[in-house]
């Protein structure tokens, strides 16, 4: 998928904001998991309590 690497261009703040907005809007679970994976990759899971 071409757009997944684009998540790396998002700031940490925008990535976290996107996660909360996506969950609030009940967006597609696969999309939310992509965001969660990027959050974990950046070691930011503690901010949103993403389980490993």
Curated annotation (Swiss-Prot):
Changing residue 34 to A: Partial loss of ability to inhibit KinA autophosphorylation. Pfam families: Sda. The lineage of its organism: Bacteria, Bacillati, Bacillota, Bacilli, Bacillales. Keywords: Protein kinase inhibitor, Sporulation. GO terms for molecular function: protein kinase inhibitor activity. Mediates a developmental checkpoint inhibiting initiation of sporulation (by preventing phosphorylation of spo0A) in response to defects in the replication initiation machinery. Inhibits autophosphorylation of the histidine protein kinase KinA, forming a molecular barricade that prevents productive interaction between the ATP-binding site in the catalytic domain and the phosphorylatable His in the phosphotransfer domain of KinA. Probably also inhibits the activity of KinB, but has relatively little effect on KinC. This is Sporulation inhibitor sda. Gene3D superfamilies: Sporulation inhibitor A. Forms a stable heterotetramer with KinA (comprising two molecules of each protein), by binding to the KinA dimerization/phosphotransfer domain. Changing residue 31 to H: Complete loss of ability to inhibit KinA autophosphorylation.
